[in-house]
Amino acid sequence: MKKVVKKILIIISVIVLILGSAYIIRRNNYIYLTQFGATTSRQMMGYAIKTKNNEIVLIDGGTQGDAQQLEDYIISNGGNVKAWFITHIHSDHAGAFEIITQNPNINIEKIYMSIEDKDWYLENEESRKEDIDDFFDVLDNNPELKFKIVEPQINEKIKIDNITVSILGIKNPEITTNAINNSSMVLKVRVNNKTILFLGDTGVESSEKLIKNQGKNLKSDIVQMAHHGQNGATEELYKIVKPEICLWPTPDWLWKNDINGTEDSGPWKTKETREWMEKLKVKQHYIEKDGTAKIKIF
């Protein structure tokens, strides 16, 4: 009887040791996800991921006016960007990138973007000519950048330290309605068993394409709300994602639909998107209007 008890205790001890080790390993594989707050009155989007071994991965970065806070973040973390993903070329996403690429104190190893040639943008969204000119001027005037640019392929998986970035969406040249937003690159980041979906400014048409081609891959624990939380991705897409946490790159005026100092005085659809998330019973929200948020993800 004593031998049986002894064996049982040994087995229990081994199980506890294995479970404890697995827990420690998992805890040591966390990442820090930073959602940057705006430093101007404009809407913007910028995220940083700090991996287990302190590699820095960026998604967009905000406007040119937001560049200083991102520069400070990069330099305080060693001055090296392992990978920079640009979802699309609008200035509220790529403006900070345009400034920081000219900083000799910052090294960028790889730049991931899925873009058309300049003429396509001018033909399909001439109203954003200034954004288009600014972005392509940076590429044309810094030829060394072109050696760092990688154009990812659909369904490609990019391993960076303890995270894996899956490319669910790339440029959509056939979609010419809301052309630049609908050309947003869509990323799904996995760390351990947690997933984060970055939609950029995905619109209705690109939502439909994502649902058709990537429906089984869209479910994610965390989602970045498309087009700053309004007039972006469809409710159907969010239902498929079924997130537990929402990341809102949304300033206060847009959150409140406030165009003149009065809530609900604007034309924006943020309140509608908020209702969608209530119906999905999402309990946790990180909102740009509340300032920079640093999130630890296991």
Model-based region annotation:
Residues K52-V57, G65-D117, N213-Q230, K242-L247:
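Active-site metal-binding motif and surrounding structural segment of the metallo-beta-lactamase
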Residues K110, K118-N181, D252-F298:
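Binuclear metal-ion centers of metallo-dependent hydrolases, dominated by the metallo-beta-lactamase
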Residues A83, K110-M113, S207-G291:
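Cap/insert and terminal regions of metallo-dependent hydrolase folds
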Residues M1-I15:
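N-terminal Sec-pathway targeting helices
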